[in-house]
């Protein structure tokens, strides 16, 4: 069986500067992978390139999703195919409620106009499972949200949109230990209902991985994946930093 995500020799440039210099990465359906690396290694660039951000230009290599070459696909087509990106810093949208946003997103994902009643029913079910206040749906999207609330909102989106691959770009940034546990448990709660969901977590830190329990950990350094291992690789990085790869 072909992997869900296969990246081969991917080169990506931003504003004419090459950031990714030949990334190879494979993620199977239902697997959790972590991508670690120092600042400037290209982690967020890879996340943006996977989602088809137009500012991130693929200059060589391929991205295959479920056996199809999606290297040139626009962002909306990738999203409809089942790729989900959780941003490091989600945008606040004044005047648009969480419910309104999710109705539009769910309708686009499923290719059908979903009623407000159907959205509210699905939201209430998942908010109860995720330990969220039902009134959360009436708040304006990410407006005045704490860091933990923004991440809960993204987990709610992930649950309702039912992607096949979720890319979490530094979702642990700025979160305390309790909020990290909420994120980790929330992801596992979603995967209980959708065990085929694959997750690629982009992170600097090993802490969130203690709850997520990744199958594979990849080290991105200077635009390339230079080492792949299990959770022990994350512990090595946490203990000693990146010095052994700088030499």
Spans of model-derived segments:
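Conserved structural motif at the start of ABC-family nucleotide-binding domains
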Residues: 5-7, 20-22
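Q-loop/switch helix immediately C-terminal to the Walker
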Residues: 85, 89, 95-110, 122
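ABC ATPase NBD coupling module
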Residues: 57-59, 69-84, 237
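ABC ATPase C-loop
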Residues: 158-159
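The feature captures the beta-strand-to-loop junction immediately N-terminal to the Walker
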Residues: 36-38
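Walker B catalytic motif
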Residues: 170-171, 178
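Conserved beta-strand-loop-alpha-helix hinge in the C-terminal portion
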Residues: 216, 220, 224-247
């Amino acid at each position: 069986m072909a992997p869900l995500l296969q990246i081969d020799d991917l080169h990506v440039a931003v504003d004419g500067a090459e950031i990714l210099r030949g990334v190879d990465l494979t993620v199977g359906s239902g697997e959790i992978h972590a991508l670690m690396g120092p600042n400037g290694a290209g982690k967020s660039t890879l996340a943006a390139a996977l989602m088809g951000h137009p500012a991130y230009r693929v200059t060589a290599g391929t991205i295959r999703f479920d056996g199809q070459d999606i290297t040139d696909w626009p962002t909306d087509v990738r999203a409809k195919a089942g790729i989900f990106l959780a941003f490091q810093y989600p945008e606040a949208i004044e005047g648009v409620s969480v419910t309104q946003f999710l109705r539009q997103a769910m309708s686009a994902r499923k290719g059908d106009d979903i009623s407000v009643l159907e959205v509210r029913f699905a939201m209430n079910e998942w908010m109860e499972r995720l330990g969220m206040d039902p009134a959360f749906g009436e708040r304006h999207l990410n407006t005045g949200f704490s860091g933990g609330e923004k991440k809960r909102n993204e987990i709610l989106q992930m649950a309702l949109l039912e992607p096949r691959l979720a890319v979490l770009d530094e979702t642990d940034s700025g979160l305390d230990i309790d909020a990290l546990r909420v994120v980790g448990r929330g992801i596992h709660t979603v995967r209980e209902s959708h065990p085929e969901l694959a997750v690629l977590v982009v992170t600097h830190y090993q802490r969130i991985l203690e709850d997520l329990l990744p199958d594979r950990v990849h080290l991105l350094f200077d635009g390339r994946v230079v080492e792949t291992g299990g959770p022990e690789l994350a512990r090595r990085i946490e203990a000693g930093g990146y010095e052994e790869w700088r030499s």
